[in-house]
Amino acid sequence: MKPDIKICGLKTPEAIDRALKRGATHIGFIFFEKSPRYIEPDLAAKLAEPARGKAKIVAVVVDPTNDELDEIVSLLKPDILQLHGNESPEHVLTIKALYGLPVMKVFSVRTADDLKRVEAYIGIADRFLFDAKAPKGSELPGGNGISFDWSLLSWLDGSIDYMLSGGLNKNNVADALVKTRARGIDVSSGVETEPGVKSVAMIDEFFDAVETADAPVMAPGS
């Protein structure tokens, strides 16, 4: 069973085209203005059109207002909302009810205590994404090019569906898949020449590394 692969922080048609040709299952657009990967919703909507029906379109937001979500959902028409802020379980339920879209809830991880919060969202969020906690002083909640201790995920019940993120690149993604058996992986900075600038060559190298990985990806419910 191959893992889902999400290329996040996309901003150009060339990068999107290469991601789709290589088999990306998800493409992500970031609507957090402090990020170098930020994109205006109307431009994201235009860039996303070739992906419809080929990959899931993911809108990545950080503690958005209702007005911000209204604009993003109206223009982009995403398949999934990725919540990368401090959204409570109740807020996640409200967002799901308002927009009728599945939610992927992000948790920033440094220690085992960071994962204890997951339990309150089980049965509420449709999927989880585990990213490395941002270094002190960083304004970005993700996309910082750092990893966390993947062994912390070993306590998770096999029925918990998650994507692994945080510092993944061509050099470590195979090891990450073997050690975590994650059913999905998310990459952004690992396929960039500089923050916000995706490289089609690095996208190719990342997919090559995934394809050569001998990883027993965990099936749902196992």
From Swiss-Prot:
SUPFAM superfamilies: Ribulose-phoshate binding barrel. Its EC number is 5.3.1.24. It catalyses: N-(5-phospho-beta-D-ribosyl)anthranilate = 1-(2-carboxyphenylamino)-1-deoxy-D-ribulose 5-phosphate. Gene3D superfamilies: Aldolase class I. It comes from the Bacteria. One of its GO terms (molecular function) is phosphoribosylanthranilate isomerase activity. GO terms for biological process: L-tryptophan biosynthetic process. The keyword Chloroplast does not apply. Keywords: Amino-acid biosynthesis, Aromatic amino acid biosynthesis, Isomerase, Tryptophan biosynthesis. Pfam families: PRAI. Pathway: Amino-acid biosynthesis; L-tryptophan biosynthesis; L-tryptophan from chorismate: step 3/5. CDD domains: PRAI. Belongs to the TrpF family. NCBIfam families: PRK01222.1-1. This is N-(5'-phosphoribosyl)anthranilate isomerase. It comes from Rhizobium etli (strain ATCC 51251 / DSM 11541 / JCM 21823 / NBRC 15573 / CFN 42).
